[in-house]
Amino acid sequence: MDEKELEKEITKNVIAYLSQDKNEEILAINKERIFLKLEKLEGMCNQNFLVSILEKNSNKILLQLVYKKFGIMSKTGDHLLESYIIEYLSKEDIGPKLFLEKKNYRLMEYIPETRHIDKEILFNERILNQLSLILETYNHFTSTYYYNIIDNKIKIEPLYDDNTTFKRINITKTYYDNIINTIFKKAKNSFNKFRNEFIQKIPLKGNEESHKILNKFKYYLDNFQENFDKFYPKEGFLVMCHNDVNRYNFIQKISDGKLYCLDHEYASLNLPGYDIADYFNETNFHFVPNYIFSFEQINYDKYFSKYKIYIKKFIESHKFLCNNSKGKNFIDFITSRKYYLSLHQIINYFWFLCCMAYLDFNSWYSEKKKSFYIAYDLIRFYEFGLEKLKI
């Protein structure tokens, strides 16, 4: 869909919303005397637009909304669960309000005078404290679950002795199951198609390194289950996680520095500490407007002390886990360096698979072999091998 078609689609959908909504603020708007102005916002996998509704005569802004058109990678997400989380976080005043949810797009509150977390202050103490509180709130969206994995199938059981006051809903979606039964299958199918076309159209002579990389990708996909199971614990406890904690999924009020959390399509039950490790992991990358990365930046050990501070807070709010030996052993495990590095392996493999799931030969070839997905896969592949040696 080109830009003009997309603008028409957005305008049509927003006008339809304005015509049906019963909100007093919207009812007061004369639909015959307005026009819409669209501004594209930063985003990695979705198309986000600031929609300003203006009065024709005065150009006065009557209302502003965020229109989010779901992108290709968001198809692996759960938009219904995401809408529940948005509602929950908005009540906690750490996320924008949801106005309308449809199959291909979403309308949300626009929070003015905000920006993404600046790269220079990612490890500012105030930022980390706010981030910790948001992730802790996230963890309490559902009950804590006990899980065990047998024959690549995960079984979960909610723990009802969690004496917190947060509202609970029943969740069955797990990160492990999403990877095993959804993303991996898509990655395998997509890669096989890509590889077949690559072999047919890219000669081996003169392209030996590219073919070598392709074979390495094939090896990690063929041995996915064996490799992944080395790092994902066979039993333990799960909490609700965001699973995509990078600076582009947070906005910060310019006036007071308050953080708001965005984009929850990857949310699911996952391992404690995953989100904070993901945040440390993603600080190595700069995605928009241009993809920038340096191998020399990777040093997960330097974040381990900050990870332990976060985990200490997690343990304090989940003291009930220490009521039995399984809980005590798991608490000891999640404070260890081995567990922390395993989280990074899991993170790297997850994004490796996500990129593989959306490989397209024609797009790759037309971009002169500089596809974002290929570059990102190379990084994740490199990291996986590097960190595997440490563990």
Task: Locate each region found by the language model.
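ATP-binding pocket architecture of kinase catalytic cores
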Residues: 39-185, 230
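A general structural signal marking secondary-structure boundaries and capping sites
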Residues: 18-22, 93, 135-146, 228, ...
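A glycine-centered beta->alpha junction motif in the catalytic cores
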Residues: 70-72, 104-123, 140-144, 196-199, ...
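Active-site acidic catalytic loop and adjacent metal/ATP-binding pocket
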Residues: 41-62, 222-275
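An alpha-helical support segment within catalytic cores of ATP-dependent transferases
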Residues: 10-25, 158-243, 253-255
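Active-site activation/catalytic loop segments of kinase-like enzymes and analogous catalytic loops
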Residues: 273-325, 345-364
